[in-house]
């Protein structure tokens, strides 16, 4: 049996890490027998490849890190996440996943870590009960990273404008389809739905939530993806 090592969840989130939720959806789609194991100990997290989650542990104890690494691992075992897609659609899917995982993710990081309202929500949820000093030190490192990417150097209005542009682009791709590339879930849905869900409610800052909530078609889409995934999706203890 495969084991997904993941950050915990709560408040309706399978995990507060959207990449962990992505990995869980990929595991569900793969048909593999798997289980969830939450990682709470910082020392255990430090021993993970890349010192981050998600990570899958296989029956031999081998650790497979990163949501895209997990996808490749599952594909090597026979999983087919983009069945029925043309070569062009597969290229579009790959580009969309990169936009979500790298552009929308930066929006989410700013909405949770940079904005004071978002950070207050993080302290009440993700870091509830954790001593403030190490958490604040960790936040400072995250903010340094966001500054290095350049994203946090934009003012709020510019960030929100870019968020609106990205969400509008995804909404255009979705159209009137059930999922992004038709009537069946594909790999792109596993990335996109959890990220939009995270931007649509706390602990994301209210300004980002407001922009995301204006896209009702995307919110309905997120519900479809999560409902399909949740048929047997493990829940946080």
Placement of each model-derived feature along the sequence:
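Acidic carboxylate-rich catalytic motifs and surrounding loops in phosphoryl-/glycosyl-chemistry enzymes
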Residues: 37-43, 185, 235-237
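GST-like domain detector, emphasizing the conserved glutathione-binding G-site
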Residues: 1-132
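A general structural signal marking secondary-structure boundaries and capping sites
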Residues: 78, 174-177, 229
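Non-transmembrane alpha-helical segments in soluble domains
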Residues: 71, 75, 94-97, 101, ...
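Alpha-helical oligomerization segments
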Residues: 223-237
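Short, hydrophobic secondary-structure boundary micro-motifs
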Residues: 16, 83, 180-183, 208, ...
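GST-like fold's C-terminal all-alpha helical module
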Residues: 105-219
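Amphipathic alpha-helical segments that form well-ordered structural scaffolds
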Residues: 22, 26-29, 162-173, 224
